[in-house]
Amino acid sequence: MTFSLIICTYMRPQPLLDLLQSVQNQSLYPNEILIIDGSTNVETKEMIAKNHFENLNYFLVAKENRGLTKQRNFGISKVNSAIEIVCFLDDDTVLETDYFQNLISTYTTFPKALGVGGYISNETNWEKVQGNYTPKSNEFYFDGWKRKDGSRFILRKKMGLDTNRLPGFSPAFSHGRSVGFLPPTGKIYEVEQLMGGVSSFRKIIFDTFSFSTYFEGYGLYEDADFSLRVSKMGKLYVNTSAKLSHFHAEGGRPNLYKYGKMVVRNGWYVWRIKNPKPMLKDRLKWNAITILLTLIRLSNVVTAKNKKAAFTESLGRIIGWWSLLIKRPKDKKKPVGLSI
């Protein structure tokens, strides 16, 4: 099965090199690697020129194609016509040697799969427990494994605002648990949302779908938007044996005020992708959880070391929420597969 790897990057030459070196060590190597660089300098271009990687093509995009979703759409337009699977990786990830072997084999195991995601293994400490285990209020339990729950979910459980869906599925009021809440069992799980930076899709779906132009620049939640639309047409899976590490490089991220606004406004947009006409109870829950999460972040002004960062992001969230009363998010160009 032929597959292409698209890596969209911005001002991160060293993390990108680390990723490419891990790709070089793969037991199954990509038929094509496309580097889509939105950098405003030539450091990444120079790094690529100094290092040789088989099947690699480099593109430095102009301003009009800069930004995660634009770069992804640009990359898709450059994929070889013979390719069957298109893979995406964040530029600050590092793969285990059998990542692609396990990821691509999922399409053979599930021939009707439209998309398959990999598994980030370095962000959460999981512990295997007995099958009859009863989790504590500050724990999350799933499929024989437990992990510590964050303060936001602990409070949500106490207030009756926890999600009623499995990890990787979005409830009618959104604010679900991501695929990051799937344990490292080595199993393959069906989901309806994939993390864009560790995802793959059959190339044929791009004849119908594209990444939304609403998500410009950093593109927060663009992966949720895209995968939710695709999941309405077919099955998506996460293979927890396709492992990689994510190191969250600082370069190329928006300021925290803009990020806070994105959390709320982009979150609202994705919620309406899943549920374009929510019932009153779902509207109330979405707003209640959004306000609760803002208050939790605001409390970090007192509890966290970086008080300025907590305040700046909280202000962005507050302004983002109020802005929904004035102007709700709307895609500049309605993407195919979207009903809103």
Can you name each region flagged by the protein language model?
Residues 12-26:
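Short, well-formed alpha-helical segments that are part of the catalytic scaffolds
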Residues 63-81:
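Glycine-rich, basic loop-to-helix element that forms the pyrophosphate-binding segment
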Residues 82-94:
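Short beta-strand-to-loop acidic/aromatic patch adjacent to the donor-nucleotide binding site
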Residues 98-166:
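Conserved donor NDP-sugar-binding/catalytic core segment of glycosyltransferases
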Residues 159-171, 181-200, 231, 253:
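A recurrent flexible, glycine/aromatic-enriched loop bordering the glycosyltransferase active site
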Residues 236-309:
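Active-site-adjacent helix/loop segment of glycosyltransferases
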